[in-house]
Amino acid sequence: MKTLLGKIQVPDNVFSGIRGRSYSDNARLHLGKSKRNLYKIDLTSFFPSISRETVYRFFFEALCCSPDVAELLTNLTTVDLKKLNQSNLLEVYDFLANKGVKCYNHLISGAPTSQILSYLVNHKMFDELQSLSDKNNVTMTVYVDDVIFSSEHKISSEFRQSVLSLIKKYNYQVSRKKVKGYSKTYPKLVTGVIINSEGKATIKNALRKKIMVEYEYLQNNPADIKSRQRLRGLITAARQIDKSAGHSQILCKVQWVQE
């Protein structure tokens, strides 16, 4: 089903489970020759807040599926907590209640179809956010529950409030702790990528440290195949962020593991 959903055309600034698009591509849209102000928000408990009814309406109305087909597809992509026989179900209820989520029949967290569906079933909300951004000369990207806005100009408090009001209109909540604004010269963290004070993507220090720790371990345990694979994966992740990272001192030290 993910393959079929992936055939639906979505805007170029959407990176929610889209084949060929990654978290680093999402951050890259906020780079540029000039430094940019940035404003980012996180939708609280996004998947559990996407109700079965919302998913059903998408299949029935947007994709014009028959009622029985829409019902089947909804059953495959949502979960009803009340039908699950779990010993810790009360703990789950309490957790969701503390997050302000009142929906117990919702999009499945972790399912391969959920990321793309989280955008598709809410495309009207994201379209409105995009329209608002266009009117204010703001660049917007969507990576699942992370919505990022950037501009060469100041991002006004009026714009920020309009964003929050629009999201509230669609019955979603924003994690206040994860709402952040950055000035042009301040380093920014965007979906795991650091945008430095010069407006360029750089590798997080935590990733550099992981590479060095794994490299040192592999030097002492050269026959450890899993360590070799982990190191290769870390290098690949670093190069997704900064393609020139392969020439840095850190990554040159581990170049041999890719031979």
Question: Whereabouts are the PLM-identified features?
Answer:
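Right-hand nucleic-acid polymerase module
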Residues: T3-E71, N75-A111, Y119-S133, K154-E259
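Short acidic donor-binding/metal-coordinating loop in glycosyltransferase active sites
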Residues: L43, V144-D145
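Conserved, non-catalytic sequence blocks in retroelement Pol enzymes and Pol-derived host proteins
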Residues: S114
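Short beta-strand
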Residues: T139-Y143
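Short beta-strand->loop micro-motif that forms the acidic, two-metal-ion catalytic signature
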Residues: D145-S151
